[in-house]
């Protein structure tokens, strides 16, 4: 069994503001290609969080890949109870829809948000309950994933825990490949 934690930037950090944004199409294309390789190499659990951005897009891509790879399991772990409860109705509905579709979901802390320790406990849970991590993150462009990046690097100093970064160069290569396939008449919808 191989369990992959995948996280990364929030949607606003990537300037993606809508499901029809061309940047989102490229990100999902890159995630699909990457996760397909991971599945074919033995990953059977894709574990992500519920944050708006890479985490929710990862869950969406994982659910789509289950049609081709029914053995794949998708889990969403949330840092605390009532996660997303302060979001607008549309974002709350998107989260609830994803939670209803994944194979497993649970909060690491059942309590609503109380303090930053819950976020640290969430990170610790994720690294100790997965076999590897992938971050859509570029260390030259810090953001929210910096905390996960630092924790994973420290954890991997004392544990066999591989980290893969999907950085902006990787995303640019994916954008080029996506554009080339579109120009050749390949339909991604």
Swiss-Prot record:
It comes from the Bacteria. InterPro entries: YspA (IPR010697). It holds the Pfam family YpsA. SUPFAM superfamilies: MCP/YpsA-like. HAMAP family: UPF0398 (MF_01575). Belongs to the UPF0398 family. NCBIfam families: PRK13660.1. This is UPF0398 protein lp_1753.
